[in-house]
């Protein structure tokens, strides 16, 4: 049990570090050092949270592999985007394969009114075509990982009967922020929260580019041309809604 709890922290740190680790310049810059510091803090928090006997913030601690899937999705997204973005610098067959994979996905997922197309429409006018291609490929890769995450979890719930095989589901341990004494029927509140999370998980990939466009109109141009900025923005844009969708499915279950 101790080893299982200990193993959660390194994945958090690795997912946050690898975007800079594959690019040596990041370690010589302030942003790179800040990412490492935040990764260490996040890893320490996850370790303390999982090792403690009583829950505080993290949900579904004792309903694996819910959180494990989320960590793996973030790690995989950051890794794929990093290798794809650094393809020319790495100049390896693996990097070339990821670059070709990104171009293939962009052709499949970039269609009218798709989230990927809306991301492109949110870019400032005059964005170079090469940069637009990079953003399109990154958005396609991140969105595919998010869809895969949702499908994988839905399969676990529908086919494997999650979380039934993990024993009795303790609401207090797995939903520490949910107050069953808050008033009203508990099942009705869980279904309401489930519906809200699923709707937000579906809509956010469409609404976020529009919100970004409004922010640009208010505060001026915002550049995402930096490799690390592009990687983390695309990761958050895709994985955060997927996490909300997962939470909605879990609450409905």
What residue ranges belong to the model's regions?
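Alpha-helical transmembrane segments and their helix-start/interface "positive-inside/aromatic belt" motifs
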Residues: 1, 60-77, 139-148, 188-198
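Loop-to-transmembrane boundary segments
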Residues: 1-9, 182-205
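N-terminal ordered "arm"
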Residues: 1-59
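Juxtamembrane "helix exit" motif at the C-terminal ends of alpha-helical transmembrane segments
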Residues: 23-25, 204-225
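Alpha-helical transmembrane segments
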Residues: 30-39, 137-158, 230-239
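Long, highly hydrophobic alpha-helical transmembrane signal-anchor segments
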Residues: 55, 64, 68-69, 86-150, ...
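Juxtamembrane inter-helical linkers in multi-pass membrane proteins
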Residues: 162-185
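Alpha-helical transmembrane segments and their immediate juxtamembrane interface regions
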Residues: 216-253
């Amino acid at each position: 049990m101790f080893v299982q709890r200990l193993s959660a922290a390194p994945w958090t740190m690795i997912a946050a570090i690898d975007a800079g680790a594959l690019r040596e310049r990041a370690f010589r810059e302030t942003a790179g050092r800040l990412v490492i510091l935040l990764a260490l803090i996040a890893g320490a928090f996850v370790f303390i949270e999982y090792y403690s006997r009583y829950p505080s913030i993290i949900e579904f601690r004792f309903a694996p592999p819910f959180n494990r899937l989320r960590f793996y999705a973030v790690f995989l997204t950051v890794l794929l985007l990093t290798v794809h973005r650094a393809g020319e610098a790495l100049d390896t067959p693996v990097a070339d394969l990821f670059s070709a994979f990104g171009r293939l996905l962009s052709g499949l997922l970039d269609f009218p009114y798709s989230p990927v197309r809306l991301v492109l429409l949110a870019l400032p006018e005059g964005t170079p075509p090469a940069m637009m291609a990079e953003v399109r490929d990154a958005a396609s890769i991140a969105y595919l990982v998010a869809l895969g995450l949702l499908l994988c979890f839905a399969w676990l719930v529908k086919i494997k009967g999650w979380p039934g095989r993990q024993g009795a589901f303790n609401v207090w341990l797995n939903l520490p922020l949910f107050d069953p004494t808050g008033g009203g029927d508990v099942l009705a509140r869980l279904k309401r929260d489930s519906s809200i999370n699923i709707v937000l998980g579906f809509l956010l990939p469409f609404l976020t580019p529009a919100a970004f466009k409004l922010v640009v109109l208010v505060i001026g141009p915002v550049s995402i041309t930096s490799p690390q900025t592009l990687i983390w923005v695309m990761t958050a844009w895709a994985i955060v809604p997927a996490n909300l969708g997962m939470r909605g499915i879990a609450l409905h279950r």
